[in-house]
């Protein structure tokens, strides 16, 4: 290999190292890494003030999508105490940006010159090969050709000189970047020592107060029902589907029961996603058939009405056995006092924030809805209320925070029309509309864990989020 070719090889190797340094080492030198990014994100949360600095929770509500919202008053902030350091940090970042732009220019020029060097390398290899094969006698014509070729190589010297200049520039930029990196590290350390930990403590304190807020938001008066969210279209016109109201958040199993009478097959899907896809499920075969669609899953067990009886059955999924069954005194059954849509819906079981409930009717109550609180272990009636609302005029019903909400129809145009408050044994007429998308609701149940209404609507499994009205008193309130 000739000396010029060796020089070009050295230049190419040097430029490869420079390119690698620009793409890998430069970002870490200027501090453009995950640590700096986290610090920047932390600065955004300085709005959260600790209680002793004057902010306070003054309202709380629930968004239309069902999420808990707590509103806090933030005191007016004076000029940031770290303005000097912030300005210095911005100046340093501008310098880093300028350095980065200079490096981009060098990289572009290097790429252009590299293409030229590669073409010259091909020419020099051709000359080297001709010199090696030439004999002792070289004609004047051959000398002229060699001279012409060497003339073509003359511009290469200026390219190499430019490489030398670029190398010096890179060395200078690298030194500047090192200085900037040191300054950034010092600022980062100072802000981390005096700011980030304090911010983290404030955020933790705020999270604790928001958690307390969420606990207080557990109950409230129903003021709105969201638009329907169709999860799946599966099964016949009537049925029920549900999740366990007492399960931990990691347990997202879904139970599916198609039909409204004489059914025994219960499908258990591992997750809501599996339910949507119709996969990963097991089958439970109940020892006694069910009636209606008012079933509920509570703390690992299914509570349902035994077909052609007023018997409540508690079936445990894990042991696949009936733990207890008991007659509900005086309760009508076999389409004696169903909802307006029929379907053997004489007995409807519900769970809210306070426990297990049964909604039904007796002859003694003249067909009016009776609400009974049940002991989930023995199925004994703890207490009962006569709501005075005729069950055959109700489309469906559900419990939220000890309040029974009744719809006036199971068809299109239905709304939540009546509310009975068990804590005061009083009632009121309401006007809370909701969109009955598929025009025939045969199951409507509230899940307190998810604060959502589960609905079976004409063969569609549908969810509704609810809006609850809350009145929250803070520690400073009289």
Curated annotation (Swiss-Prot):
Glycans are attached at residues 33, 98, 179, 299, 334, 423, 465. InterPro entries: Noelin_dom, Olfac-like_dom, Olfactomedin-like_domain. Residues 218-470 form the Olfactomedin-like domain. Induction: Expression in SMCs and carotid arteries is up-regulated upon injury or by PDGFB. The keyword Disulfide bond applies. Residues 86-109, 160-218 form a coiled coil. It is found in: Secreted; Synapse; Membrane; Nucleus. Disulfide bonds join 219-401. Expressed in the brain (at protein level). Expressed in carotid arteries and the aorta, mainly in aortic SMCs. GO terms for biological process: locomotory behavior; neurotransmitter receptor localization to postsynaptic specialization membrane; positive regulation of smooth muscle cell differentiation; protein secretion; regulation of vascular associated smooth muscle cell dedifferentiation; signal transduction; visual perception. Keywords: Coiled coil, Cytoplasm, Disulfide bond, Glycoprotein, Membrane, Nucleus, Secreted, Signal, Synapse. Residues 1-16 form the signal peptide. The keyword Nucleus applies. GO terms for cellular component: AMPA glutamate receptor complex; cytoplasm; extracellular region; extracellular space; extrinsic component of postsynaptic density membrane; glutamatergic synapse; nucleoplasm; nucleus. Involved in transforming growth factor beta (TGF-beta)-induced smooth muscle differentiation. TGF-beta induces expression and nuclear translocation of OLFM2 where it binds to SRF, causing its dissociation from the transcriptional repressor HEY2/HERP1 and facilitating binding of SRF to target genes. Plays a role in AMPAR complex organization. Is a regulator of vascular smooth-muscle cell (SMC) phenotypic switching, that acts by promoting RUNX2 and inhibiting MYOCD binding to SRF. Peripherally associated with AMPAR complex. AMPAR complex consists of an inner core made of 4 pore-forming GluA/GRIA proteins (GRIA1, GRIA2, GRIA3 and GRIA4) and 4 major auxiliary subunits arranged in a twofold symmetry. One of the two pairs of distinct binding sites is occupied either by CNIH2, CNIH3 or CACNG2, CACNG3. The other harbors CACNG2, CACNG3, CACNG4, CACNG8 or GSG1L. This inner core of AMPAR complex is complemented by outer core constituents binding directly to the GluA/GRIA proteins at sites distinct from the interaction sites of the inner core constituents. This is Noelin-2. The gene is Olfm2.
């Amino acid at each position: 290999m000739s000396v010029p070719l060796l020089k070009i090889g050295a230049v190419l190797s040097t430029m490869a190292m420079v390119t690698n340094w620009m793409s890998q080492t430069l970002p870490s030198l200027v501090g453009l890494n995950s640590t700096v990014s986290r610090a920047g994100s932390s600065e955004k949360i300085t709005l959260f003030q600790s209680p002793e600095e004057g902010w306070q929770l003054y309202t709380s509500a629930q968004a239309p999508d069902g999420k808990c919202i707590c509103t806090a008053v933030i005191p007016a902030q004076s000029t940031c105490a770290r303005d000097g350091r912030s300005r210095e940090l911005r100046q340093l970042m501008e310098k880093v940006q300028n350095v980065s732009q200079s490096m981009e220019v060098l990289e572009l020029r290097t790429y252009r010159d590299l293409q030229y060097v590669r073409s010259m390398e091909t020419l020099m290899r051709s000359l080297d090969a001709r010199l090696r094969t030439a004999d002792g006698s070289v004609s004047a014509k051959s000398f002229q050709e060699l001279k012409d070729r060497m003339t073509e190589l003359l511009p290469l010297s200026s390219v190499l000189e430019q490489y030398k200049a670029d190398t010096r520039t890179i060395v200078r930029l690298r030194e500047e970047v090192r200085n900037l990196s040191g300054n950034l590290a010092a600022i980062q350390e100072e802000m981390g020592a005096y700011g980030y930990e304090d911010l983290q403590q404030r955020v933790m304190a705020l999270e604790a107060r928001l958690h307390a807020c969420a606990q207080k938001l557990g109950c409230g008066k129903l003021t709105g029902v969201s638009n329907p969210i169709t999860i799946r279209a599966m099964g016949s016109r009537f049925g029920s589907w549900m999740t366990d109201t007492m399960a931990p958040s990691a347990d997202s199993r879904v139970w599916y029961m198609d039909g409204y009478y004489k059914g025994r097959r219960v499908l258990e899907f591992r997750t809501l996603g599996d339910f949507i896809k119709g996969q990963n499920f097991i089958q439970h075969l109940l020892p006694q058939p069910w009636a209606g669609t008012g079933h509920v899953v509570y703390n690992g067990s299914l509570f349902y009405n035994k077909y052609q009886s007023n018997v409540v059955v508690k079936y445990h999924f894990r042991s696949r056995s009936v733990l207890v069954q008991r007659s509900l005194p005086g309760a009508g059954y076999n389409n004696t006092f169903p909802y307006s849509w029929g379907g053997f819906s004489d007995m409807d079981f519900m769970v809210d924030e306070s426990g297990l409930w049964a909604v039904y009717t007796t002859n003694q109550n003249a067909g009016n809805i009776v609400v009974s609180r049940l002991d989930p272990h023995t199925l004994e009636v703890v207490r009962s209320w006569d709501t005075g609302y005729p069950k055959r005029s109700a489309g469906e019903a559900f419990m939220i925070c000890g309040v029974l909400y009744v719809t006036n129809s199971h068809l299109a145009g239905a709304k939540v029309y009546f509310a009975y408050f068990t804590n005061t044994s009083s009632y009121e007429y309401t006007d809370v509309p909701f969109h009955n998308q598929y025009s025939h609701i045969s199951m409507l149940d509230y899940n307190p864990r998810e604060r959502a209404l589960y609905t079976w609507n004409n063969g569609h499994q549908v969810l509704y989020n609810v809006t609850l009205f809350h009145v929250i008193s803070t520690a400073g309130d009289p």
